Amino acid sequence: MPDYLKLKKSNCKNCYKCIRHCPVKSIKFQSDQAHIVKDECVLCGQCFVVCPQNAKEIRNDVPSVQAMLNSGSRVVVSLAPSFVANYPGATIDTMKAALQKLGFNAVEETAVGASIVKTEYEKIIAERRQKVIISTCCHSVNTMIQKYYPEALPYLAPVLSPMQAHCKRIKEQDPEAKTVFIGPCISKKAECDESP
């Protein structure tokens, strides 16, 4: 697993908060430093949230996005609706304007994908294909089931996440477009890498 989330050596103060809050216990402590056990991590971000020393670092994808913007390709943003939590007073229109000033060609809400996904869930329920359905919208949950609860794999809905559904729709409408997802979730980085 690439370094989506890593720990900065100099900042760790041995408080063990990350270890206590990790739902899958994928953090070990060695040589006065916390280390993420990559093969066990589900990228939920709890360690990042609870660290009082800012000792966690999330992979920076800005250089890759800048390269896309500089390539001359059409670049479309899929914007998670949670942006309103980080930018009080912002609307989709103000976000579109700001992102287009940065060079993006278009900005759409990931909610477009959520609508597609909702329709798929309705079909599964109406056709009674599965008695028990676990939503596949959260990549961390999907990863946790794959790694720790494989007996629950048959219950995962065979449906794309809203992000994937939206980006697929964008590429169907504009096959040459490159897509960039902007949202708060660390595990979405892995999801993007696993399903380009």
Predicted regions, residues:
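Iron-sulfur cluster-binding cysteine motifs and their immediate structural context
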Residues: P2-K9, K13-V37, V42, Q46-V62
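Iron-sulfur-associated redox domains of electron-transfer enzymes in respiratory
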Residues: R59-P196
